[in-house]
Amino acid sequence: MLKEKLKKYKIILASGSPRRQQFFKDLDLDFEIRLKDVEEIYPPELKAVEITNFLAELKANAFEGELKENEILVTSDTIVWHQNKALGKPKNAEDAFQMIKSMSNTTHEVITSVCFKTNTAFTLLHDVTKVTFKDLSDESILYYIENYKPYDKAGAYGIQEWFGFMAVTKVEGSYTNVMGLPTAKVYEYLTTLV
């Protein structure tokens, strides 16, 4: 449906995330993947959605001057926001353990910003999902880290994996946002372009 309406456009997904790529396939959208190395550093005074907005826009700006007239670039960034602090991807097993342990028996926010950029304009949107974990044993956290190696995931966990099935007691908002892309919002925005 939307795929037909977007025929005159070429969607460029600037993400190496297998989950985001799968979401675009599952949304039945034709797209091309283009990647750039971008150092994901943000000013320390930024908080919550300011961080993800900044990083999604930073990633899009790496393509400045390279987009053709019919191309729509899509970049995004996801963080876990917990105890007034951003939890990105863990550096190692100890970092992953500390992140997950800090979220045990509490609620945190998963924030994703998505930037849509053409050669003449850009639009930023974001989504926030609240996720609650049960009280987690050290043993279950260590098992997850050892067996699933969540080093490519913000907050050191994947809700779609064993850990999510075992640990998550409540989700308020978009489930796909927790996996890295608020698909309903992305789809809705793309429908406004045609």
Curated annotation (Swiss-Prot):
Keywords: Cytoplasm, Hydrolase, Nucleotide metabolism
Gene Ontology MF, one: UTP diphosphatase activity
Localization of this protein: Cytoplasm
Keyword rRNA-binding: no
Cofactor: a divalent metal cation
The keyword Cytoplasm is annotated on this UniProt entry: yes
Residues under site feature: Important for substrate specificity: 19, 78, 160
A GO cellular component entry from the record: cytoplasm
EC numbers for this chain: 3.6.1.9
Active site: 77
Catalytic activity: dTTP + H2O = dTMP + diphosphate + H(+); UTP + H2O = UMP + diphosphate + H(+)
GO biological processes: nucleotide metabolic process
Cross-referenced InterPro entries: ITPase-like_fam, Maf-like
Family of this protein: Belongs to the Maf family. YhdE subfamily.
The protein's role, per its UniProt record: Nucleoside triphosphate pyrophosphatase that hydrolyzes dTTP and UTP. May have a dual role in cell division arrest and in preventing the incorporation of modified nucleotides into cellular nucleic acids.
Matches recorded under NCBIfam families: maf
Name this protein carries in UniProt: dTTP/UTP pyrophosphatase
